[in-house]
Structure formats: C-alpha cells, structure tokens
C-alpha cells in the first residue's frame, strides 16, 4: 500500500475511531453485520474491526467517555508519534497523554 502524503503537522489521516459502548456483545453483532465482516480482535476489553485499513473499535469502558457517537475518539495515523507531538505542540497543540506503547507494535498519544 503506498504511503499517504504526510502534511506539515505529520498527520497522514484518521487511523482509528473508537466508540465507547454499554453492551459490547450487542455492538459487536451490530457492527459485524453493518460492515459485513468479523472483528480481527475480539476480547472482553476491546473489539476491533479492520475496515480497509481503518479501525472501528468498540470499548466497553465508559468511565471517561459517554457511550455512543458523542463519546467517540478518533486517532490520527502518523509516521513518528513523538515527532508529531513535538511539532503540533510548537503550533499550539496540547499533548494530554505522552506517547506510549499499547501493544502489537503500536504507539499512541493523546
């Protein structure tokens, strides 16, 4: 897959959108039907669907975000998380959570 052009802030496009859900099994069944595929990751703490290179995630932890689309969180795809955080901070962005490894070779920051 060709790499997308990186913008001046290091952002390449949305990588993931994660919805907090109250009923993980019901949401999993709904989205499996809606996107016509099974999740690639299916655990009690998270369900993930790969939809042509973008992730739809379902998170049963609603302690910090309200369930449904209003509580959804989008994550950007970048080449270098630490460098992108630095560059976005320089132009007025705020890093809420420093870059950290979250498993599977993935690093994230908020």
Go through each PLM region and give its residues.
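Short, surface-exposed beta-strand-loop junctions and turns on beta-sheet-rich folds
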Residues: 55, 64-65
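Conserved beta-strand in the GNAT
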Residues: 56-59, 110
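Short linear motifs in intrinsically disordered
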Residues: 35-40, 75, 98-100
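Core segments of cupin and vicinal oxygen chelate
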Residues: 12, 18-56
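Vicinal oxygen chelate
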Residues: 1-10, 14-22, 47-50, 65-110
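Acetyl-CoA-dependent GNAT
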Residues: 41-42, 59-63, 101
């Amino acid at each position: 897959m060709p790499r997308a052009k990186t913008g001046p802030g290091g952002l390449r496009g949305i990588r993931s959108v994660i919805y907090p859900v109250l009923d993980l099994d019901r949401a999993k069944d709904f989205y499996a039907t809606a996107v016509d595929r099974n999740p690639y990751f299916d655990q009690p703490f998270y369900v993930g669907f790969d939809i042509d290179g973008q992730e739809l995630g379902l998170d049963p932890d609603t302690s910090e975000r309200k369930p449904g689309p209003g509580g959804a969180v989008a994550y950007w795809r970048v080449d270098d998380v630490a460098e992108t955080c630095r560059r976005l901070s320089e132009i007025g962005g705020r890093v809420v959570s420093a870059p950290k490894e979250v498993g599977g070779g993935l690093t994230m920051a908020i």
